[in-house]
Structure formats: C-alpha cells, structure tokens
Amino acid sequence: MKPPILIIIMSTVMSGTMIVLTSSHWLLIWIGFEMNMLAIIPILMKNHTPRATEASTKYFLTQATASMLLMMGIIINLMFSGEWSISKIPNPIASGLVTIALTMKLGMAPFHFWVPEVTQGISLSSGMILLTWQKIAPLSILYQISPSINPKLLITMAIASVLIGGWGGLNQTQLRKILAYSSIAHMGWMAVILTYNPTLMILNLTIYITMTLSTFMLFMHNSSTTTLSLSNTWNKLPLMTSLILVLMMSLGGLPPLSGFAPKWMIIQELTKNDMIILPTFMAITALLNLYFYMRLSYTTALTMFPSVNNMKMKWQFESAKKIILLPPLIIISTMLLPMTPMMSILE
C-alpha cells in the first residue's frame, strides 16, 4: 500500500473513532462507527492473500450486523424517548440491543467467533490495530451508557468471555490467536466492572492496550507468528527473550507485574459491592490465561528446541530496528504495580 493512501485510510480510521468519542448524538455515533469500519477493511486486506480477504469479509459481515442492531436499538430508543441524546436509554429493549451491538463489535462472548479467525488471517501490524485501537470506540459508548445497561446481561457476557478467552487459548500454537483469545478475556474483565466503577474500566483498557501494543511490537520486531518461530528468539535476539518472558507474564496477570494491577482493583471493587462468588470465579478462571502464557514463556525462554544451528548464539546479529515507543511501553507494561495505591483516587 502506497504511503499517501495509507495516511488517508489511517486518518479516516482515527477520525471515525474520534467522532464516536466526542459525540452525544446517536446518529453521529453511528456514522463514526461506519467510517471506522469501512476504513479499517483496506488495512486488513493489505496482504492481498485469500486468507486476508476471508478475514476482512468475516470482519465486515460481523460489524455490519452489529451496526444494524445498533441502529435498531437507536430507533427504538427514539420512539420511546423522542430524543437522539446518548444521556439515557429508558427502554430495556433498546438498551439490550445497543449493549449486544457494542459487545459484538468488541468481540465478547457469545459473539466472539470472528475475533480469532480474523486476527489469524491478517498481518501482525493489522492485528495490533484490531485488538487495540478498535476497542476504544465501543467501550467509550458503553462507558457513557453504563447507568442504562442491564447489569445481569453484561455480567453474563463477561463471565462467558473470561471462560472462553481462557479455554480457547489453551490449545493454540499461533501467537495471533493466543492474543485474540487474551483480548476476549480482557474484555470480560472490563465488562464485569463497567456497571460498578466505569472509571476502573478505563484504567483496565489503558493497561491492556499498553501491554498488547508492546507484545505485538516485539513479535513484529522478531517476525514471529508461531510458538516455533518464537522458540528461536534466543538465537537471534537474546534480550528479546527476556522481554517477551516478562510481557507474557504481565499479560497473564502475574504479580508483581502491571497486568495484575487492574485484576486486583476489579476484585477489590467487586468485594466492596458485596459480591464474593463472582470475583472468586473470575480469579480462578484467569489462571487459564496465566497457564497458556506460562507455557508460551517456557517455550520461548526456558527451552532450546532442536536446531540445525549448533552455535548457542549468532556470530553476526541482525541490525536492530529502532522502535522509539517500545522502551516506555515495556516499562509501563511491567512496572506499574507499585503505583496502584495512587490509582485509588479512581474510586
């Protein structure tokens, strides 16, 4: 893709999200979602392979269905309230339709089937955009309408997402699919706290985006898409091996890394609201994610796979690509836990 075309498409994707973030009118929000969806498809298809075309088609059909449900919910809300404002949704049917549409756009269970397939069919850079930037707009609308959402519906979807995100990633060898299932699980954690403390959801989203960006950048730097290619990292870039190990543990939510902080705060907030069984169940389910990340870390950093190259290290290293954003992102992704007491102001 030529740079001028890429710049135009990327600015349209960003403009669509910004329209959603800054609007309080339902029609403008819907237009923002449509702009974003139509602009992201050429980015997903930039590889020009049958797999990328299939992934883009799946993404388009899912997002178009979600947009249709969203518009239906908006029209029902307009019939009952007589206004286009996002401030409140008095009708439960309209609220349910809007919630389902937004969770479908996020890829939460039971509408999660497209996420692993689409992520696997596209390049690492496109997958990075899909699993980070594309989550911002739907979550911002859920944040704004959180008082009108049915808590039981959202909690049910959150539990299903955490379960499927954990179980789905157990049998995977493709890194993009593992990150896709991890995304589904993280969306579940964000959804469960949304009706109790929406600001905590924003914190969780920020940490999730930082960790996912760092992980994708490391995989892109190393050109790794499978666990087998990742197992040769020690031979090419020894420092990357340690960084990937720590980032995997952080994404799995292992203390004392940054990924543990949002889970800790969410469990604390739920227990303050006299909910004991739900946070206990979610904490146990999070161990599934931690397990497949530990397995990935073991493959990457703690074992040496059979190789035709008998040397322990390359005599000539590849020229390291300079990624300016990577060092601060890795620091935030791994060392944020000591700052957790400062984040208590969010409550």
From Swiss-Prot:
It catalyses: a ubiquinone + NADH + 5 H(+)(in) = a ubiquinol + NAD(+) + 4 H(+)(out). It comes from the Eukaryota. InterPro entries: Complex_I_Subunit_2 (IPR050175), NADH_DH_su2_C (IPR010933), NADH_UbQ_OxRdtase_chain2 (IPR003917), ND/Mrp_TM (IPR001750). GO terms for cellular component: mitochondrial inner membrane. It is a multi-pass membrane protein. One of its GO terms (biological process) is mitochondrial respiratory chain complex I assembly. It is an enzyme of class 7 (translocase). It is found in: Mitochondrion inner membrane. The chain crosses the membrane at residues 3-23, 25-45, 60-80, 96-116, 122-142, 153-173, 178-198, 200-220, 237-257, 274-294, 323-343. Keywords: Electron transport, Membrane, Mitochondrion, Mitochondrion inner membrane, NAD, Respiratory chain, Translocase, Transmembrane, Transmembrane helix, Transport, Ubiquinone. Its EC number is 7.1.1.2. One of its GO terms (molecular function) is NADH dehydrogenase (ubiquinone) activity. Its main location: mitochondrion. Core subunit of the mitochondrial membrane respiratory chain NADH dehydrogenase (Complex I) which catalyzes electron transfer from NADH through the respiratory chain, using ubiquinone as an electron acceptor. Essential for the catalytic activity and assembly of complex I. PANTHER family: NADH-UBIQUINONE OXIDOREDUCTASE CHAIN 2. Core subunit of respiratory chain NADH dehydrogenase (Complex I) which is composed of 45 different subunits. Interacts with TMEM242. Belongs to the complex I subunit 2 family. This is NADH-ubiquinone oxidoreductase chain 2. It comes from Halichoerus grypus. The lineage of its organism: Eukaryota, Metazoa, Chordata, Craniata, Vertebrata.
